[in-house]
C-alpha cells in the first residue's frame, strides 16, 4: 500500500500542508529547518502511531495549535484506506476510513514503513532501543505479534506489581502468582518463537545485502534470549516455568521480573565481533541499511 496524498494540520512546524505523492520516488528538497524531516516523521507516525524519535506526543503539536491532525490517503491494488491520527496533549485518536479504532493492533500494519535516519544508529546498541525497533518491524508483518506482545506486556505489568507488593514477613497469595506465572510463561514462549522466526528469515538474506552495499560478508543478527530453545514447544514452556520458579526469591527481593522477552538482546555481529563495540560508524549505518 502506498500513500498518494498527505494532509497535516498543526504538525510540528506546519500549520497546514497538503502533499500529492507519486507511486515512484518522491524527493523533498529545501533549506535546513524547513520541515523536510517532519514530513517523513509524519508518515512514520501514521504507520506506527508514534515518532521514531523518542519524544512525547505533545511535542508533535505545533506551538500555536491545541491538536495535530495527520491524514493519509493510501491505495493498493485491491483497497483504498484513509488513515487519520488526531493528537492532543492528553489523548490520541486513531481512525480508518472515518471509523475510530480503539485497539493499536487493529490500526498498525496498514502501511509498511522503513526509515533510515541518524537516530537509527541507536538500533545496534544493546537494550530497549533495539527491542523497540525490532518490535515495530515485526509488527508490520504480523498482526498476531502485536496482540501477543500487548498481552505479554499486560501480564508482565501485573506480575511486577505482585512482586513489588509482596511483604517478606507476611503470607501472600501464591496460588494467584502461580496462575499469573502460567500465563506469563505461555505468552513469553509465543513472543520469543515469533521473534526467532523473524530473525531466522532476516539472516537468510542479510549477509548478501550487506555484501552488495559494502563488499564485505559475514554480517549476522544474533538473538540473545534467556529462554532455552527446543524443537518442541511444550518442552520450552516446561523448562521456562522451572527457570522462573528458581528465580522467584531473587525476583521477590528486587520486586521485578528478571526473565522473559522484555530482557532479550539483539546483536549485530560482523565477522563474529559485536558491531556496536568494534564497528565503525560507516559499518553500523550500512548494517542498518541492509536490515
Task: Annotate each predicted stretch with a short phrase.
Residues 36:
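Conserved lysine of the Walker
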